[in-house]
Regions:
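A domain-start/cap signature at the N-terminus of enzymes
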Residues: 1-119, 280
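Gly/Ser-rich "nucleophile elbow"/oxyanion-hole loop immediately N-terminal to the catalytic nucleophile
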Residues: 115, 169-217
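Active-site machinery of serine-nucleophile hydrolases
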Residues: 119, 126-190
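Alpha/beta-hydrolase
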Residues: 121-123, 240
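The conserved beta1-alpha1 loop
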Residues: 123-125, 264-265
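Short, proline-enriched alpha-helix->beta-strand connector loops that line the catalytic pocket
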Residues: 151, 254-260
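Primarily recognizes the serine-hydrolase "nucleophile elbow" in alpha/beta-hydrolase
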Residues: 201-254
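C-terminal catalytic histidine-bearing segment of alpha/beta-hydrolase fold enzymes
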Residues: 261-322
């Protein structure tokens, strides 16, 4: 059986995924990769960027795709599937130390610069929780790029516990939830995360005036929730596509003196998410908060970035295509 390793790799100007297959056929032609999400009418092709022979193995670089779904990599007449994958790697992860402290599982990038430094807290989205301290980094590759772009910052990326059944409830139209209990970005877990940051401030490692928070989807909701868990800790927040519930909507409308910039889109898997975000930002602006901003991407703008917005795609097909 061939040894298959899988990596998340930043290439020139784009981010993709790479396979390394030992004892694969020497023939480099006819290499294809397709996804087969449950319920999909037909397999979805994924672009193969390059195929090279290196050190007795094939190196195959592709566009990004949801590697946790069902995929088939074909090299001539040979097929390889997710079930045969032996190893998952994240290029660039080595700069992040794996830590578990005071009930919080997290990755931490430490800058070489001395003295109190800024800190950026990143909260992952739904489906990327667990206890391996790698899934949230592999799925949200931006964490690696943060360390490259903001090399003078501390970058903290905790992983929340997760259970099946949380996401469907979270994605119900404007569902009521306060994320209590041990799962997701609950107030209790966020409090423990913030305690670690305050400990780093007390130790002189972090500049108390330059602590920032961002997150995507469930992590975007966690970003808003973190702003209310420890008032005054964060200098600014950037929630990306934050999940909207009555609780997070109330928090958003109450951030009258906070600096925040929300990014979201009309095309979303949660019904009317953007409507409540727009209402919340407009309420803040009407209340005099000129530091509350919103970027709302249109389908045309998303398409310009290569993001599939075809309304005929099923939800799972759209996720896989992106």
């Amino acid at each position: 059986m061939s040894n298959i390793s899988f990596s998340h790799v930043p290439f020139a100007g784009w981010t993709g995924l790479g396979f390394s297959i030992d004892h694969a056929p020497a023939e480099l032609s006819d290499v294809t990769l397709t996804l087969s999400p449950r319920g999909a009418a037909a397999p979805i092709p994924v672009a193969v960027r390059s195929v090279t022979a290196e050190g007795g193995a094939l190196k195959i670089e592709t566009d990004e795709f949801d590697y946790r779904g069902n995929w088939v990599l074909c090299i001539g007449d040979d097929k390889y599937t997710r079930a045969e994958m032996d190893e998952e790697q994240v290029e660039g992860l080595e700069v992040y130390e794996s830590r578990q402290e005071d009930g919080v599982l997290y990755r931490l990038y430490t800058p070489e610069a001395k003295g109190p430094r800024p800190l950026l807290l990143f909260l992952h989205g739904g489906g990327n929780g667990g206890d391996d301290n790698i899934t949230h980094i592999a799925a949200d590759y931006g964490v690696i790029q943060f360390a490259e772009r903001y090399s003078d910052f501390y970058i903290m990326a905790p992983q929340a516990m997760e259970r099946k059944g949380v996401l469907p409830k979270m994605n119900a139209p404007f569902a009521e939830t306060d994320q209590t209990g041990p799962y997701g970005w609950s107030r209790a877990y966020l409090g423990a995360v913030c305690d670690l940051i305050r400990k780093m401030i007390a130790e002189g490692k972090v500049d108390a005036r330059r602590v920032y928070v961002t997150g995507m989807s469930m992590g975007g909701a966690g970003t808003l929730r973190a702003m209310s868990v420890v008032a005054g800790l964060f200098a600014a927040a950037v929630p990306v596509c934050p999940s909207m519930t009555p609780e997070t909507f109330r928090i958003l409308c109450g951030l009258k003196h906070s600096k925040l910039w929300i990014a979201t889109a009309y095309v979303d898997h949660t019904i009317y998410r953007h409507k409540y975000i727009v209402d919340g930002i407009m309420a803040l602006r009407d209340a005099g908060n000129q530091n509350a901003h919103l970027t709302l991407y249109s389908p045309e703008e998303l398409a310009a970035f290569g993001i599939a917005t075809d309304p005929d795609l099923t939800l799972k097909e759209r996720f896989s295509a992106n």
